[in-house]
Swiss-Prot record:
Protein name: 1-aminocyclopropane-1-carboxylate oxidase homolog 3
Binding site for Fe cation: 241, 243, 297
Keyword terms, alphabetized: Iron, Metal-binding, Oxidoreductase
InterPro entries in the cross-refs: DIOX_N, IPNS-like_FE2OG_OXY, IPNS-like_sf, Oxoglu/Fe-dep_dioxygenase_dom
Organism for this UniProt entry: Arabidopsis thaliana (Mouse-ear cress)
UniProt entry tagged with the keyword Oxidoreductase: yes
Residue ranges annotated for the Fe2OG dioxygenase domain, each copy included: 217-318
Family membership noted in the UniProt record: Belongs to the iron/ascorbate-dependent oxidoreductase family.
GO CC annotation, single: extracellular region
Cofactor(s) the protein requires to work: Fe cation
Length: 369
């Protein structure tokens, strides 16, 4: 096991506090002209390891599959069934897939990415007004939600907003990206309901099963900004983790960096023009009793000269009150395949996930029977 060198002059707690109190995030560091990554962002080399060469039996696993959703209007039952089978295989083996012809216009995707850039590239004084660690706020701008609990900080800033089930009031959102956030989240909600129909059928259930379980009821939007990193081999954009959602819809940038971990190996996710990246979250793995899997993933530090942006929309009600208990779906368990997880509320799962932070271990282990 690697031992981290201890510097007696390095006061991590003080440096974290000083960084947070600037209220300008990683973007503020870059704007100030830093040429070295501060120690609070240094990750152990074991966490930064580059992908090992694939053994011969895994060479066929190039990357996550890309699935055509037919504009969400399958006129041909065979094409719909083919898409369901592709989703079934991807959700069971990868937990990730890209979708094209998904029904969200390319123009809207570009406007959403521009909205993220516009917010993060405002003046520091304007951004500071939104910076907070009060997680009860509707709109939140900060750097690293787990800054004070994670082993190392990530080279990334984020703004987040709960978009459903309670739609935010216009005055809750920054004017610079207000309209596009509202419109984009509506489109993602519609796409999510459609995907949950296909996922239900892939499980052998009625099309409305997962939607009736309120899997598509809540939506949390996280808009990430990854500034160029002067020493990308020392840190990460996002640490290794799995998502505490039912499903995540990710709008990526042309600048690549996302990697998915499968069978002990890291796979790059390539840019596919106009595609959205879909991944199974922990809660969907839990209720499907491991029929679908929530794989760990990470984002490498940005080596480009331009900032990388992404928008992750998580289908979950998070820490908002929701008394419904979630456990393995009754139709998916039997004497031969008993429940593997205990029941939990979404709030309890999210609270445990947030307290644990992005430490490279799955929160699902805590809920195993």
């Amino acid at each position: 096991m690697e031992m981290m060198k201890i510097d007696p002059l390095f006061d991590r707690a003080s440096e974290l506090k000083a960084f947070d109190e600037t209220k300008t995030g990683v973007k503020g560091l870059v704007d100030s002209g830093v040429s070295q990554v501060p120690r609070i962002f240094h990750h152990p080399t074991v966490k930064l390891s580059t992908p090992k060469p694939l053994p011969s039996d895994l060479l066929h696993l190039k990357t996550i599959p890309t699935i055509d959703l037919g504009g969400r209007d399958f006129q041909d039952a065979i094409k719909r069934n083919n898409a369901i089978e592709e989703i079934k295989e991807a959700a069971a083996k990868w937990g990730f897939f890209q979708v094209i012809n998904h029904g969200v216009s390319l123009e809207l995707l570009e406007k959403m990415k521009k909205g993220v850039r516009d917010f993060h590239e405002q003046s520091q004084e304007v951004r500071k007004e939104f910076y907070s660690r009060d997680f009860s706020r509707r709109f939140l701008y900060l750097s690293n939600f787990d800054l004070f609990s994670s082993p190392a900080a990530n080279w990334r800033d984020t703004f987040s907003c709960t978009m459903a089930p309670d739609t935010p009031k216009p005055q809750d959102l920054p004017e610079i990206c207000r309209d596009i956030m509202m419109e984009y989240s509506k489109q993602v909600m519609n796409l999510g309901k459609f995907l949950f129909e296909l996922l239900s059928e892939a499980l052998g259930l009625e099309p409305n099963h997962l939607n009736d379980m309120d899997c598509s009821k809540g939506l949390l939007m996280l808009s990430h900004y990854y500034p160029p990193c002067p020493e990308p081999d020392l840190t990460l954009g996002t640490s290794q983790h799995s998502d505490n959602s039912f499903l995540t819809v990710l709008l990526p940038d042309q600048i690549e960096g996302l990697q998915v971990r499968r069978e002990g190996h890291w796979f790059d996710v390539p840019h596919v023009s106009g595609a959205l990246i879909i991944n199974i979250g922990d809660l969907l793995q839990l209720i499907t009793n491991d029929k679908f899997i929530s794989l760990e993933h990470r984002v490498l530090a940005n080596r480009a000269t331009r900032a990388r942006v992404s928008v992750a929309c998580f289908f979950t009600t998070g820490v908002r009150p929701n008394p419904r208990m979630y456990g393995p779906i009754r139709e998916l368990v039997s004497e031969e395949n008993p429940p593997k997880y205990r029941e939990t509320t979404i709030k309890d799962y999210a609270t445990y996930f947030n307290a644990k932070g992005l430490d490279g271990t799955s929160a699902l282990l805590h809920f195993k029977i």
